[in-house]
Amino acid sequence: MKDMNLHSAFNLKMKELKDNEQASTYLSYQSALKSLESFGGTYIPLERITVDWLKRCERFWLSKGKSYSSISIYFRALKCILNRAIQDGILKESSFPFGKNKYEIPEGCGRKLALTLADIKKVMSYQDGTKDIEEFRDLWVFSYLCNGINFMDLLFLQYSNIVDGEICFVRSKTSRTAKHSKEIHAIITPEMWNIIHKWGNPRINPQTYIFKYADGTENAFERVRLVRRIVTKCNRRLKKIAQNTGISQLTTYTARHSFATVLKRAGAKTSYISESLGHSNLAVTENYLAYFEKEERIRNAQLLTDFNI
């Protein structure tokens, strides 16, 4: 155990994740290890990971086109690995490189991911005569209207999740970690009912999946692979819609940000938006709304020389 290196430490953690069927987290750690080894080589001694090493690693990743969001994910995984090594007596606490006055993990900046209502109208009304585009456009619309539901949750919704005209679900992302998982409630709008009737499975029993993509036999890793496949297909179609409508960026992820930002622009309280998204705290929601805050600053700055007021 004393000779444990980064590769073996990650593999130990990944085995636990695999045994617990935490597929998404497993794949996230796998990606982090691959990226760390692309900089530092294989079998990196834990003691080699210093503040300077982390700074050089960050610069290396940025030069390769990695985003700060990705860097943050990789380093959070590494931080957990090193914390575990300290707890197990493998690494001295004084060697821990993260924290105040050491290396601080960068936060993903608030990128403009949300669409305006005008752009959302373009998406919802877009037609090119093909069922292929129509299906994945409708999936995006459903995600947007259903509180920005993540595709991991959307594809595995069952008819039992429909209660009194609402879709009620717990986010798979937080169901394992949160002590008291928050149930999200999304009113089913007429547009959502139309999408269910158009693309959904007929209701056989409460456990019937609303949509046709899953069959219930998938294990944890197959579920993740299924979601990634559908998301990839959806994003390809969304890219075509964006190109043909003049929308700068349209992906499955923009549905969630658009839901939050449209409500904020309409005057909804951040606490309500946070609850609707199923966030654990307001700080997470505020990060979603970071670009909205920039828009506010731009408008307010323009007021300073608006002599027509």
Regions found by a protein language model. Give the residues of each.
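Basic, Lys/Arg- and aromatic-enriched nucleic-acid-binding interface segment
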Residues: 98-108, 113-151, 155
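Catalytic-site neighborhood detector that most strongly recognizes the C-terminal catalytic loop/helix
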Residues: 114, 171-176, 277-302
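Active-site/catalytic core of tyrosine-dependent DNA strand-transfer enzymes
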Residues: 120, 189-247
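Short, basic (Lys/Arg/His-rich) helix/loop patches that form interaction surfaces
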Residues: 232-275
